[in-house]
Amino acid sequence: MKGKRIIIIGAGLLQVPAIQIAKDMGLYTIVLDYNKDAPGMKIADYPI
């Protein structure tokens, strides 16, 4: 995997804008949340 990556802890409604901004900047988003149904998990490149 080439390119820059970012890890965002939490995928709730408050983290969705941060995930989207990171993706708009061309970053590969790795998102961690215990809730697999959190909204940010659907837009992350690699949800954990």
What is each stretch, according to the model?
Residues 1-48:
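ATP-binding N-terminal substructure of ATP-dependent carboxylate-amine bond-forming enzymes
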